[in-house]
Amino acid sequence: MAASRKSRILIADDNATNVELLEVYLAGLDCETAVAVDGRDTLDKVASFKPDLILLDIMMPKLSGFEVCKQLKGDPATRGIMILMVTALNELGDIERAVNAGTDDFLSKPVNKLELLKRVEIMLRLRHVEDEVERLRRYIEGMEDSTGPGA
């Protein structure tokens, strides 16, 4: 069995104050964090950092959070990454658009620290359960291959 690694959280926000606040809030968690400052940077960091969760702002330069989310959720290699949109937008239409883009959850700014941390914990737990289910699925498929006809 592979050794477990720390959870990885990517903070994607073009506002340095928001990034600093989120980093302070996440400091008590046993996780690694990285920062992306715009939509394209977010996609680049996803490829190199391989996050379990992205805290994604919607209103960013180059690509909006909606566009980033839609691209990530549309790609089989990245669709399993949990996305929590953390944004100043809070109208029902914004939430609907975020859900349609594929977000897993939505949190309006200003964020409450406890609410953010609980949502992050739940989403990371869910991500790890999904990873374990996938690992077991591959294991079972391997067992079936070795016990099938001609084995």
Predicted regions and their residues:
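Non-catalytic signal-transmission and effector/linker regions of two-component phosphorelay proteins
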Residues: 1-10, 23, 127, 131, ...
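Two-component/phosphorelay signaling modules centered on CheY-like receiver
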Residues: 8, 16-37
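Active-site beta3 strand of CheY-like receiver
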Residues: 49-55
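Receiver (REC) domain active-site loop signature in two-component systems and cognate sites
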Residues: 60, 83
